[in-house]
């Protein structure tokens, strides 16, 4: 597919509110690691993708990779909804070394927080927390400020704060 054709399709999906652009967050960093400046796309309503794939909960449970992508889009959608009354925005972070945060929550006064989305599993939660701690250490906190919080957003049942200060929060616990 040619690039102009792809642009036409992406613009149509945006106008139909099927995808939403999430721009890259570019904080002041301590290191010289280049950042990826390209935005990412998330589905406005991940249930549409499940319908197009003609799958149900059992089908998604047998394809955890697809379920993970849909869960991440669901989480980003909900975070955007909860930030709207605060005039905040959801961005993403990824550098050329592969360090990423699925969502960076930014408020107009400069406060920020980083979020990794993991459906569950202690190993995945540990990986997400490690990524968040690495990101917080990499950011020049004198210029950007310390993160308001670091959170691994999960599909689990219990919210808790780890000894390293990273919050582990089920998506179901988020509310206004």
Model-derived features: where do they sit?
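Short helix-terminating capping/connector loops at secondary-structure junctions
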Residues: 86, 142-147
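Short beta-strand/turn micro-motifs composed of small residues
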Residues: 94, 152-154
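Switch/connector loops and helix/strand junctions flanking conserved nucleotide-binding motifs
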Residues: 51, 125-126, 159-163
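Active-site ExK catalytic segment of metal-dependent nucleases
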Residues: 111-123
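Accessory nucleic acid-recognition modules appended to NTPase machines
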Residues: 1-111
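Mg2+/Mn2+-dependent nuclease catalytic core
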Residues: 120-141
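Structural beta-sheet core signal
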Residues: 114, 151-152
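Domain-level recognition of nuclease-like catalytic cores that cleave nucleotide substrates
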Residues: 155-176
């Amino acid at each position: 597919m040619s690039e102009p054709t792809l642009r036409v399709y992406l613009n149509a999906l945006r106008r139909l509110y099927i995808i939403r652009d999430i721009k890259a967050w570019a904080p002041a960093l301590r290191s010289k690691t280049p950042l990826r400046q390209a935005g990412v796309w998330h589905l406005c309503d991940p249930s549409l993708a499940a319908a197009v794939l003609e799958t149900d909960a059992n089908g998604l449970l047998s394809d955890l990779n697809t379920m993970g992508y849909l869960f991440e889009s669901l989480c980003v959608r909900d975070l955007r909804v909860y930030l709207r009354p605060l005039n905040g925005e959801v961005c993403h972070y990824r550098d050329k070394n592969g360090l990423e945060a699925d969502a960076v929550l930014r408020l107009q006064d400069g406060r920020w927080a980083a979020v990794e989305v993991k459906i569950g599993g202690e190993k995945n939660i540990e990986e997400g927390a490690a990524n968040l701690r690495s990101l917080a250490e990499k950011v020049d906190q004198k210029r950007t400020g310390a993160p308001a919080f670091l959170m691994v957003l999960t599909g689990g049942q219990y919210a808790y704060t780890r000894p390293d200060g990273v919050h582990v929060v089920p998506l179901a616990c988020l509310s206004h």
